[in-house]
């Protein structure tokens, strides 16, 4: 194959991948998954991955491998379904890039350039997992994990790291103003900004933890109020959604995207982590909080809402579903954007009415086998009437 022939082949394959129609798959009544991933490393533009100059790249080989596209924040903006994607290269470094779709389920195309995120303080080794919030103050905020090497690590320890919550804001998703990293007495990941003021303050869902990986004595989804996003300092924090022994969130849990407001309460999507023989298993779960007090949990169905299925189980980090973006349309349709195994992005759709019904009418976890059997028998009895 000549250089020109290979280039035409690459272009045709790339266009076919992007424009392939994505079909829904009938589900459990709560949501419908879609058959194909919406974003992978292969969706990245060819001019990101290849030097297209025959003189400098006569074999037309990849010069910058885009290995994965996952863990994306989401927002409806100018009539388009927008994802701020965690893109990872072969060098393990993540960066943010915007992809947009006209319909939310397929035809996602990356913008021409990745986001150039300004640094704050010591340059970050890695940044990832942005949550987007269009706040009532008029700004779009992005909060993301900032990873740096642990300065107290022992000589030769090249794995220890420190996590902080990076904060940035924008009006156009192109030009970002970097604000100071969040200050907290603990390491923080999975920090999410509530979309409305609460008692005149900005409200944050937090996830305090003792270490970069381990929750230790910390963990759980926290709640904190702050005066300003221009310098976020957490001084008073409470846990509103706890970890619990022998559940899908016994090791860790964390808020996903910002909650969706409904007449019955705030809908929350979160992830829970438990240990198993193959390592850490990440699943998604839901809960609801009160409209009057968004820190008060009013419903939480037992177990997981979504878990890896089929080939979703396979990837760089096996047995993982993670979500940090969803979009609720004005007609009540909800687009749930989730990643599988730190490798690719998917979408599932539902409605606000169905998700509220799921949360309010699915019984909570009673924490023992005996109570689970009672819960099942109650359903059987109702169906036999």
Regions found by a protein language model. Name each.
Residues 311-328:
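A conserved acidic, glycine/proline-rich C-terminal tail/linker
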């Amino acid at each position: 194959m000549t250089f020109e022939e290979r280039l035409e082949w690459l272009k045709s394959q790339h266009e076919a991948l992007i424009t392939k129609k994505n079909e829904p798959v009938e589900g459990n009544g709560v949501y419908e998954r879609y058959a194909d991933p919406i974003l992978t490393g292969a969706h990245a533009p060819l001019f990101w991955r290849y030097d297209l100059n025959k003189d400098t790249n006569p074999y037309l080989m990849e010069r910058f491998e885009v290995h994965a596209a996952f863990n994306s924040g989401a927002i409806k903006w100018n009539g388009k379904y927008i994802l701020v994607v965690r893109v990872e290269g072969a060098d393990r470094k993540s960066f943010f890039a915007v992809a947009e779709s006209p319909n939310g389920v397929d035809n996602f195309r990356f913008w021409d350039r990745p986001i150039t995120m300004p640094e704050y303080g010591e340059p970050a080794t890695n940044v990832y997992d942005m949550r987007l919030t269009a706040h009532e103050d008029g700004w779009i905020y992005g909060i993301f994990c900032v990873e740096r090497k642990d300065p107290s690590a022992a000589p030769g320890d090249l794995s220890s790291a420190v996590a902080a919550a990076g904060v940035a804001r924008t009006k156009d998703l192109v030009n970002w103003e970097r604000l100071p990293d969040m200050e907290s007495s603990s390491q923080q990941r999975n920090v999410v900004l509530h979309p409305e003021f609460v008692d005149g303050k900005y409200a944050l869902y937090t996830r305090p933890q003792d270490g970069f990986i381990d929750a230790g004595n910390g963990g759980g989804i926290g709640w904190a109020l702050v005066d300003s996003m221009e310098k976020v300092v957490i001084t008073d924090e409470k846990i509103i959604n706890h970890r619990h022994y022998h559940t899908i969130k016994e090791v860790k849990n964390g808020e996903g995207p910002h909650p969706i407001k409904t007449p019955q309460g705030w809908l929350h999507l979160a992830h829970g982590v438990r240990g198993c023989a193959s390592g850490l298993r990440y699943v998604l779960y839901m809960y609801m909080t009160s409209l009057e007090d968004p820190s008060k949990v009013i419903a939480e169905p037992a177990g997981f809402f979504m878990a890896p299925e089929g080939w979703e189980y396979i990837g760089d980090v096996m047995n993982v579903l993670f979500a940090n973006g969803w979009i609720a349309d004005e007609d009540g349709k909800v687009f749930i954007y989730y990643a599988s195994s730190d490798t690719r992005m998917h979408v599932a759709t539902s409605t606000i009415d169905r998700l509220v019904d799921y949360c309010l009418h699915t019984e909570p976890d009673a924490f023992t086998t005996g109570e689970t059997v009672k819960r099942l028998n109650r359903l059987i009895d109702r169906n036999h009437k």
